[in-house]
Amino acid sequence: MQNGQVIDEFASDVNPHQELDDHIIHLTGITDQQLAQAPDFSEIARTIFELIEDCIFVAHNVKFDANLLAEALFMEGFELRTPRVDTVELAQVFYPTLEQYKLSHLSKVLNLDLAQAHTAIEDARATGQLLFHLMDKIASLPRQTIEMLLTFSDNLLFETELVIRD
């Protein structure tokens, strides 16, 4: 995503070489048969790395996703050093009175598209929409409010403050 537009997408299943537990199958709709035909991570690692190496890595609960991806890429010889932004944390800052911050809940409350939660591509698209929604909200705030928020930005995870600063 760049300047509020999707400029590229990549989606692929990955063969985990083990059976999924029932919870994951129910949550995602992915089956063992589907993954058995998917490529190994080593086959797509370079493509993923090249797509994101010069980007800001944005995720809903970035700590989980970025660490998992960085570890998998490292095992394939790639070191992921992208700045990281967490939309959970941004939503907590700019919508402090919400009852929960699950992507599905935020999508419903903020009227974002999330056709099938817990599928990587749909979650990524909804996270992008959430980021743009939050950026619009930030842009609508008085400069004095943004400056005050930035005084507390050292408490944010990773480089999440970049969204507020820009």
Segments predicted by a language model, with ranges:
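Conserved non-catalytic scaffold segment of RNase H-like nuclease domains
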Residues: M1-P83, P96-Q100, S104-H118, R165
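Short secondary-structure capping/turn micro-motifs that flank functional sites
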Residues: F41, E89, D123-A124
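Short Asp/Glu-rich motifs
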Residues: I44, Q92, A126-T127
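A short, structured active-site edge motif that brings together acidic residues
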Residues: T82-Q92
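Acidic, divalent-metal-coordinating active-site segment for phosphoryl/phosphodiester hydrolysis
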Residues: T119-F132
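Acidic two-metal-ion nuclease catalytic site recognized across multiple nuclease folds
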Residues: F132-D166
